[in-house]
């Protein structure tokens, strides 16, 4: 039996109320577009074409006549959902009032006969089977809760979220914003709280959310090949002071790395904590290990060079080698496979701050400016990842003793090919930009998503 599972990681940029990059970030409208099952979403493909960076030229459209009026006291923010459904026309029996004039249509691309329209599923996100979300915060609004309720109605019967911080015992103001929704059973979950961040990140209880998912529901619970270990995280961002020394903002790709020393140092600590947490959760069995999320590490050398950057190589080194005292110093415990990089021939497509060229193809401008922080306009960073961790050790029968094997330089480690029943489908990993037309925003987040297809042979 062969089946496939579609996995997505996506920083959805649904921050707590009042926190935004620009004048308006349209939180409720974007989340409605993502998860509503009444908008009849379609994807308009331009004959499979891609940008110079390899981003698919695919634009979503929804039925604007079915789009609900979203008042200030929106059900996405406040717990009066039932009443508002009747008042705002979200009830199917009532006629929806027209969208406010501020929701004027802005097309990202021209519609033409070159486009092929496909209906992906009930909602934009329902086309996936397992979704890792970052920046879907629960603090001070009902957005995360309503999102999970709507997702459940579309087959995502299982979910896990990062917990609220211990408000009276910490300086954290909000949760970590992590959510996993799944159409397959989540049989275990856990959360590890990172070293506290700096700058504005110090207010968020960032960490890594772990879920163990049974992707072969009818299979034996004693068979490791029926499960995946899935980790999602959102790590310390890079910030730098404005030129006038005022509040911190996101650093541009061209700013000196020394100005971000504080941020980078915290992220290095978090990477070490992440590796040890992954090892702790996975060393007793042989189930496949996947890390998916916004690691805030730029994979590219620079804006114009899509090859492996120094920060990226350092990240892989830290995630691969353990510094535990009870293990050999510097011992490589994982070989890491970057699925997006592999399917892009060793290059890193941008997931934040993409660009487009004017008609003369000489002048480049930022592709998205409504949601993106101005400091990230045109930065062309690759921050979002789906990584496959292959063990470089074997567990003993009792799952305690470790037997390390050093692979031959000319022969790949047998552990890198240990998952015979579950494996990523070669060529399936891609950037999902979630472009949309008909709204003041042209993307559903300031980040692009990254998706892959897992193939199960049982």
UniProtKB/Swiss-Prot annotation:
Any one annotated GO CC term: extracellular region
Protein name (record): Sphingomyelinase DDB_G0288017
Function of the protein: Catalyzes the hydrolysis of sphingomyelin to form ceramide and phosphocholine.
Residues where Mg(2+) binds: 135
Enzyme class: hydrolase
Organism encoding this protein: Dictyostelium discoideum
Region (Disordered): 91-111
Site, Important for substrate recognition: residue positions: 296
The protein's required cofactors: Mg(2+)
Catalytic activity: a sphingomyelin + H2O = phosphocholine + an N-acylsphing-4-enine + H(+)
One Pfam family here: Exo_endo_phos
Metabolic or biological pathway, per its Swiss-Prot or TrEMBL entry: Lipid metabolism; sphingolipid metabolism
Top-rank taxon, per record: Eukaryota
EC number(s) stated in the UniProt entry for this protein: 3.1.4.12
Protein family (similarity comment): Belongs to the neutral sphingomyelinase family.
């Amino acid at each position: 039996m062969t089946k496939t599972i579609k996995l997505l990681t996506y920083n959805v940029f649904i921050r707590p109320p009042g926190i935004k990059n620009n004048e308006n970030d349209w939180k409720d409208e974007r989340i409605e577009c993502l998860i509503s099952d009444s908008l009849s979403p379609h994807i308009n493909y331009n004959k499979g074409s891609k940008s110079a960076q390899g981003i698919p030229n695919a634009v979503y459209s929804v039925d604007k006549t079915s789009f609900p009026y979203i008042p200030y006291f929106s059900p996405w923010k406040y717990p009066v959902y039932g009443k508002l459904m009747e008042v705002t026309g979200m009830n199917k029996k009532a006629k929806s009032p027209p969208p406010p004039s501020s929701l004027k249509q802005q097309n990202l691309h021209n519609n033409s006969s070159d486009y092929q329209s496909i209906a992906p599923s009930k909602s934009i996100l329902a086309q996936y089977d397992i979704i890792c979300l970052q920046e879907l915060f629960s603090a001070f609004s009902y957005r995360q809760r309503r999102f999970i309720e709507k997702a459940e109605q579309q087959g995502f019967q299982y979910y896990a979220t990062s917990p609220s911080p211990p408000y009276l015992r910490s300086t954290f103001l909000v949760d970590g914003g992590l959510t996993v929704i799944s159409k397959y059973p989540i049989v275990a979950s856990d959360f590890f709280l990172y070293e506290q961040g700096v700058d504005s990140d110090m207010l968020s209880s960032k960490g890594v959310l772990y879920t163990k998912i049974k992707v072969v529901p009818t299979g034996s619970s004693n068979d490791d090949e029926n499960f995946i270990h899935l980790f999602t995280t959102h790590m310390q961002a890079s910030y730098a002071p404005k030129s006038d020394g005022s509040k911190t903002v996101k650093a541009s790709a061209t700013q000196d790395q020394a100005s971000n020393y504080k941020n980078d140092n915290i992220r290095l600590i978090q990477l070490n904590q992440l590796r040890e947490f992954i090892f702790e959760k996975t060393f007793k069995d042989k189930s496949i290990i996947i890390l998916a999320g916004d690691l805030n590490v730029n994979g590219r050398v620079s804006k114009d060079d899509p090859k492996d950057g120094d920060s990226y190589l350092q990240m892989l080194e830290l995630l691969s080698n353990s510094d535990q005292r009870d293990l050999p110093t510097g011992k490589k415990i994982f070989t890491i496979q970057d699925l997006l990089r592999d399917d892009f021939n060793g290059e890193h497509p941008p997931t934040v701050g993409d660009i487009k060229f004017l008609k003369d193809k000489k002048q480049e401008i930022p592709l998205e400016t409504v949601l993106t922080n101005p400091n990230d306009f045109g930065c062309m960073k690759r921050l979002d990842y789906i990584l496959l961790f292959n063990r470089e050790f074997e567990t003993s029968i009792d799952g305690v003793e470790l037997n390390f094997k050093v692979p031959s330089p000319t022969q790949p480690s047998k552990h890198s090919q240990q998952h015979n029943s579950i494996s990523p489908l070669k060529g399936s990993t891609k950037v999902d930009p979630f472009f949309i037309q008909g709204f003041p925003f042209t993307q559903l987040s300031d980040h692009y998503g990254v998706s892959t297809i897992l193939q199960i042979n049982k």
